[in-house]
């Protein structure tokens, strides 16, 4: 996840260890703030574009669909650094948890699904709404969830005992769940 190396905090660490050899590896070479990896690292040793990784079998083909929710208007939210502010987005999306849950359950069917929410409160309201639309096991976790509990939830998901895994910013990087076949970005 070397794309984080361009952050102010990481730059201080790299400057402190100025003579150290640093190898950076990331699947996210472009940052929303426009800072390129070439500003942190001397050279790119290897680049493997998505267009090559898919046919080579390293990435699955994906299908992206959008399902507008009646009455939901995101235009009232102002973007910061290219993204909608999580707090305002989470608050707004929590109001639409029920219709969103209906869409997720309808579209996911019986597929193992990971749901990404904007905030902790949003994740918990979305999980509660999902439970009203499905008899399948739905679990939610956030940064405040005990690590052992999170580990157990993930193990249960990978074993097929949890159908929907709802989270707020914890399974975004370095997370591997090959059985997941549906992702909902809410």
Regions found by a protein language model. Name each.
Residues 1-3, 123, 171, 183:
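Conserved Walker B
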Residues 3-65:
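Post-DEXD/H (motif II) to motif III coupling segment of the RecA-like Helicase ATP-binding lobe
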Residues 11, 101, 105, 151-154, ...:
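Short hydrophobic/charged patches on amphipathic alpha-helices used for structural packing
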Residues 19, 109-110, 161-162:
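Short, high-confidence coil segments that cap the C-terminus of an alpha-helix
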Residues 25-29, 119, 168-170, 186:
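A short beta-strand-to-loop transition that corresponds to the Sensor-1 phosphate-sensing loop
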Residues 44-117:
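Conserved interdomain linker/interface between the two RecA-like ATPase lobes of SF2 helicase motors
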Residues 57, 165-183:
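SF2 helicase motor core recognition
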Residues 114, 123-172:
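Conserved helicase ATPase core of P-loop NTP-dependent helicases/translocases
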């Amino acid at each position: 996840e070397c794309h984080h190396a361009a952050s102010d905090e990481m730059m201080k660490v790299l400057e402190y260890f100025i003579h150290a050899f640093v190898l950076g590896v990331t699947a996210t070479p472009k940052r929303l703030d426009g800072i390129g990896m070439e500003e942190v690292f001397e050279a790119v040793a290897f680049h493997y574009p998505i267009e090559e990784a898919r046919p080579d079998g390293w990435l699955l083909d994906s299908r992206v669909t959008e399902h507008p929710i009646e009455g939901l208007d995101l235009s009232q939210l102002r973007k910061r650094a290219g993204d909608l502010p999580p707090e305002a987005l989470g608050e707004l999306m929590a109001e639409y948890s029920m219709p969103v849950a209906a869409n997720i359950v309808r579209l996911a069917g019986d597929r193992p699904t990971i749901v990404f929410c904007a905030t902790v409160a949003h994740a918990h309201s979305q999980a509660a709404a999902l439970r009203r639309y499905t008899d399948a096991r739905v679990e939610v976790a956030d940064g405040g969830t005990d690590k052992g509990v999170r580990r157990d939830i993930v193990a249960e998901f990978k074993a097929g005992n949890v159908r929907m895994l709802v989270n707020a910013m914890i399974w975004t990087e370095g997370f591997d769940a090959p059985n997941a076949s549906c992702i909902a970005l809410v």
